[in-house]
Every structure is written in structure tokens, then in C-alpha cells.
Amino acid sequence: MFICPVCGDLLQRGERTYSCPKGHSYDLAKEGYVYLLAPNKKHSKDPGDNKQMVSARRAFLETGLYQPFSEELNRLALQYTEPFESPVVLDAGCGEGYYTGRLAEALGEHARVFGFDISKCAVRAAAKKYRGIAFAVGSSFGIPFAEAGADLVVNVFAPIVPGELARV
């Protein structure tokens, strides 16, 4: 359900790449994520959280202090996606994947879960830890996801761009 950041066409996943019908191609990193942040959306050399920030957040979240919040998010997601046979769920601003991973586990194998974040370090960490989820580096200001492609979009502590969230 990812889209090409150049032309906006739907990307098809191959063995090691995503590509669109117009021939734009994006390699999968060895960790399993794809970089879909258009150069004009970066606004800095390395946007988003750096490696130390990602490590600190992961260590904090793994203490369990936000587990009740995550469980409530999962409960609401399960309730909302119940009518869908194979729900498509997008975590907009997924960070290092804590909520995304727990959400995918709660929803089970019938759900297709995607996550994106502007931080390459965060997405790399997420993709390394949560292998069954499709992760991408991308921006909330130009979400690399198909129009009306998600049955549920979650956004936990990330920038909210109402028009983009409504689009996906």
C-alpha cells in the first residue's frame, strides 16, 4: 500500500525492492524497510530522532510504563477493525515500532500492518525488531501510502497533518 514519492503510483514489493509502474524503484534495506522520503521533504540532513534518542525511547518504553496505554490502543484497534476480514492498519509516525509491534501482535496474522516515520534511525530499529511489519522512512506531510488504503490509522505522539491522515 506504499506509494511512490515521485509519481504517487502504488508500489509493488519485489524480493528486494519496491517499484512503481513508471519504473521508479526503491531498494529494501538489509533490515527490511524502504526509504520513501522525497529529498524535498527532508528539511535537514538527518530528520527525526537520532540513534541515541531512539535507543533511549526504546529503553524507556520497555520498562512497561506505557504498556497500559498500548493495551488500550490495542483494545480500541481490535474493536474498530473487527468488521474487516483483513484490516490494513497504518502507524503514522511509528518511531522505533513499540506501539506498531504490539498492535500487530494484538491484531494477529490476518491484519496487514504498516508503519512509517521520518527518522531513518527509528525505522531501522523498528524493522530489525518487528519483521512481519512493512516499514518505510517517510513524512507525515506527504504520507507514502495509498489514498483510502488504510482501514485504520494510528498516530501516537507524532505530528498530525489532518489532510494527509484523511487521505489515507
What are the functions of these language-model segments?
Residues 141-152:
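A short acidic, Gly/Pro-enriched loop at the edge of an enzyme's catalytic core
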Residues 152, 156-160:
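Short catalytic micro-motifs in class I SAM-dependent methyltransferases
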Residues 162-168:
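A short glycine-rich, Lys/Arg-flanked "PGG" loop and its adjoining helix->strand segment in the class I
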Residues 1-46:
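N-terminal auxiliary segments of SAM/dcSAM-dependent transferases
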Residues 75-84, 106, 144:
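Glycine-rich helix-loop-beta junction characteristic of Rossmann-like nucleotide cofactor-binding loops
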Residues 43, 48-72, 76:
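Class I SAM-dependent methyltransferase Rossmann-like catalytic core
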Residues 88-91, 96-142:
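Class I SAM-dependent methyltransferase SAM/SAH-binding core
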